[in-house]
């Protein structure tokens, strides 16, 4: 892989921060090391001294005085070593990337912790995209991604999708505008990457099948583009047999995968992680060095202690409990939809995630109905146009989340929605 063509001039110009490098050395060095290098505040001056956090089953995470000093201090930009090590083993266990033992320059699997997967994705986009570059994604798409891409001045090319995710024939048809060898010629402007949420796509709830992933990956190899696998709902697949990931089939080192703890442990702790080829992950880490410096040390230690306490088996048991909860929530919103929206709208059963994507019949644009009329009735949902490149275009779709509302609240919300639809027809 020629990674240089996926790195902008600004990203290529980034050099390691000497101060951040010293922080990395200190974090891995013996406690006897005397440091006069970094501007680390004296931890004895921090007002917080200890903490005890109670978790499931009455177990506790302890922050004694020494641990608290570390938790409140600067830490390596890539993440604290014990969390990185645990996550690397998790990725090997779940995905077994072919690139684990590749030479670093040839795309060896690397990993870094980010302040939520959104931060990682933004830095990946900024690393790759020059104004005018072509990028591929499937609409409707996560609005946060669209808002990240628009200011970068890229051309977003929509790839058709259905209930099984991206349609490979649509991708193949788009790529036929170029010849495979055009990827070696910057003037041809071949697509830099394909972005997709493969499981429980936000907002549709669609999931890519294994067969389609294989077809898509082969097209990526043929036309030499990256795949950005944004997978925050990987652990919320209602069928607990998890579909193989792009990372698991990445023989070239062309997949950048974004994972998140937001949906299964905590959204407020803002801990996610990127996995991908070392030459690209290194560029992201260099960007972190001069922006946020590093993810929260305290939050990383809290999650790391929990994961080490659980072990992989305990972690997966927790994931199963989370899946069972959201599966019941999904059943509740589907029951409410069947009860109130039959004949007024159409939808399909989400394969993963926490959203129901609804198409209202007979109404070309539901924006006013959702943003004004429903709000006045005390019901909040999102109009579908927020998930398209052209957000000003009319859309008959809306997104309803089933993550937090009770079954009774979902029932009331859809009763209100049904009433408003009938009044608008």
UniProtKB/Swiss-Prot annotation:
It comes from the Eukaryota. Keywords: Acetylation, Aminotransferase, Mitochondrion, Pyridoxal phosphate, Transferase, Transit peptide. GO terms for biological process: 2-oxoglutarate metabolic process; alpha-amino acid metabolic process; biosynthetic process; glutamate metabolic process; kynurenine metabolic process; L-lysine catabolic process to acetyl-CoA via saccharopine. The modification N6-succinyllysine is found at residues 263, 339, 367. Residues 1-29 form a transit peptide. The keyword Acetylation applies. The modification N6-acetyllysine is found at residues 69, 179, 263, 339, 367, 422. Kynurenine transaminase activity is competitively inhibited by aminoadipate, asparagine, glutamate, histidine, cysteine, lysine, 3-hydroxy-kynurenine and phenylalanine. Optimum pH is 7-9. Transaminase with broad substrate specificity. Has transaminase activity towards aminoadipate, kynurenine, methionine and glutamate. Shows activity also towards tryptophan, aspartate and hydroxykynurenine. Accepts a variety of oxo-acids as amino-group acceptors, with a preference for 2-oxoglutarate, 2-oxocaproic acid, phenylpyruvate and alpha-oxo-gamma-methiol butyric acid. Can also use glyoxylate as amino-group acceptor (in vitro). This is Kynurenine/alpha-aminoadipate aminotransferase, mitochondrial. It comes from Homo sapiens.
